[in-house]
Amino acid sequence: MYSVLLNPSNTEIYSFLTERIYRELVVIFATCKVNYKGRAESVASESPRLIILKPDGTVIIHESVKREPLNWQPPGTKIEIMNDYPLKIVAQRKRPKEVIEIDLKEVFYITSAEVKDGDFVIKGREIDIVNTIIQNPSMIEEGFVPLTREYNTPYGKIDLVGLDKKGNFVIIEVKRSKAQLSAVSQLYRYYLHIRETKEDKVRGILVAPDLTTHARELLQKLGLEFIRYDIQKYSSY
């Protein structure tokens, strides 16, 4: 559920905010003046700004540029609505002692909504790429069979080990971003170690969205292979 007030009066603003702060996410677009007192002091003159009041006490004030807010207060902030003229929002915390006072000169709109926390899953990590390969081994090549992940060596853990259709041992090093020379060198250390301990032929494959020119040259020189991983293509897996 959500509510919207367009060009509200001071009485409407006061009633709306006092009923909803700490209960709903409130967004205000208004011409306002902002005073800050705390570890320093600042005054932001009258200008149109976006003000966000979150149920956990977070207060954020945005202007038209930059990602960072003009001012903000963290969760746990005490928020009060002062029925003065102009109407004032006071956001205060004790440790450290900081106060933001927002004088609402002209409010164009206010919205509020019951916002719930959903699941948050980061995809595109190297472990996610390894999981995708295990679920879709043909993305390496037809006939590839994954055997072991996190294979221990004296030089670190190999991301994934498997066999190709000819029975050759395949070691795979995964990178979530453009692979550098260091990734090729790491793969080659694994390759040399496995080649010394296995009688079978060994292949080394670097899996990444891309790699640098120098990394590609070294990869080819060392007889290793590269497979491009399309993060967008496989993000649904």
Curated annotation (Swiss-Prot):
Keyword S-adenosyl-L-methionine in annotation: no
Coiled-coil segments on the chain, per record: none
Pfam families linked to this entry: NucS_C, NucS_N
Primary residence: cytoplasm
Keyword check for Hydrolase: yes
EC number: 3.1.-.-
GO cellular component: cytoplasm
GO molecular function: DNA binding; single-stranded DNA endodeoxyribonuclease activity
Similarity annotation: Belongs to the NucS endonuclease family.
Protein's UniProt name: Endonuclease NucS
Annotated source species: Saccharolobus islandicus (strain L.S.2.15 / Lassen #1)
